[in-house]
Amino acid sequence: MKLLKLTLISTALFSTAALAQAQQSVNVYSYDSFTSEWGAGPKVKQDFEKAHPQCAINFTPFESVGVLLNRVRLEGKKTKADIVLGLDNFFLEQAEKTGIFAPNNVDLTQLDLPTKWANKTFLPFDFGNYAFVYDKTKLQNPPKSLKELVERQDLSVIYQDPRTSSVGRGLLVWMNAVYPADKIQSAWKELDKHTVTVGKGWSDTYGAFLKGEADLVLSYSTSPLYHQLFEKKDNYAATDFAEGHITQVELAARVANHPNQCADDFMAFLISPTAQKHIVTANIMLPVIQGEIEPHFDALKVQQKTQTSINPMVNTEQLKNWISTWQTTLTK
């Protein structure tokens, strides 16, 4: 009997070791709020590895998308990443210019976005409209347009640095879509007069807002859903501006010349109903596929499709010029 037990234990240990040896690793670069214990990453990883026991997902977190993209650009073709997850439509051209990403084999007919997505290299995994979030119990008269937000000196505002944050970059695009070139500097100056802080990333700025450091914070129209669903609070709301809203589409991409079947499978898994539910409820963003994912987010998605969307085509040179204008204006 002892010999049988010893044989069984040895077999089990050998099987475990063999499985570990046979596992294929997938290195995923992403932003820290996705990979954190409360983010979507661990849940997506767990369910993916359960469905694909031959695969092991390893996350490398970065404090912002800007920092992530800079790392990828520096590493170039020597990057250890198999997948880069967390770029967005406003970083798209810069990411393409790195030359390190390859087309994926994911079926795009599953996608259901406000505008048709045809890019075969960068795969959407969630989306949402930028908005300013406020506490209804503290701010009874919220701004009804971006211009009103800029001009009202009784409002205190927090937003993110467009050089390092994708959310901050969204405001940069939004401001330049609403204000003509000859008015944009004065608009930034007006906004700066009642800006409390410009933070490096979304997490620290939203945290500062929740501590009561400002009336409004740049975030997403989905953000109040977090407080409703997870904190049972309905005092937070998102602005609905007359000029329309800018939509952010978050993206994942495969690194070229890194043959890895598990990485290909993980890309496809990102837009499965299982992964989408984890992503939308942790990221507090909207699902990118058709069908029922989560009732509250599904309802908001239908509502947002009726909102005015202003999504100008923006190239890298424009963004560089806009950032330079913003930076110069704020340092004068």
Swiss-Prot record:
Family annotation (PROSITE patterns): SBP_BACTERIAL_1
Residues given in the record as thiamine binding sites: W202, Y220, S221, T222, S223
Main location as per UniProt: periplasm
UniProt keyword annotations, A-Z: Periplasm, Signal, Transport
One GO MF term: thiamine pyrophosphate binding
Signal sequence extent: 1-20
A cellular-component GO term for this protein: outer membrane-bounded periplasmic space
Classification via InterPro entries: SBP, SBP_1_CS, ThiB, ThiB-like
A GO BP annotation: thiamine transport
Domain of life: Bacteria
One Pfam family cited in the UniProt record for this chain: SBP_bac_1
Subunit structure: The complex is composed of two ATP-binding proteins (ThiQ), two transmembrane proteins (ThiP) and a solute-binding protein (ThiB).
PANTHER family registered for this protein in UniProt: THIAMINE-BINDING PERIPLASMIC PROTEIN, THIAMINE-BINDING PERIPLASMIC PROTEIN-RELATED
Protein family membership: Belongs to the bacterial solute-binding protein 1 family.
Name the record gives this protein: Thiamine-binding periplasmic protein
Origin species: Haemophilus influenzae (strain ATCC 51907 / DSM 11121 / KW20 / Rd)
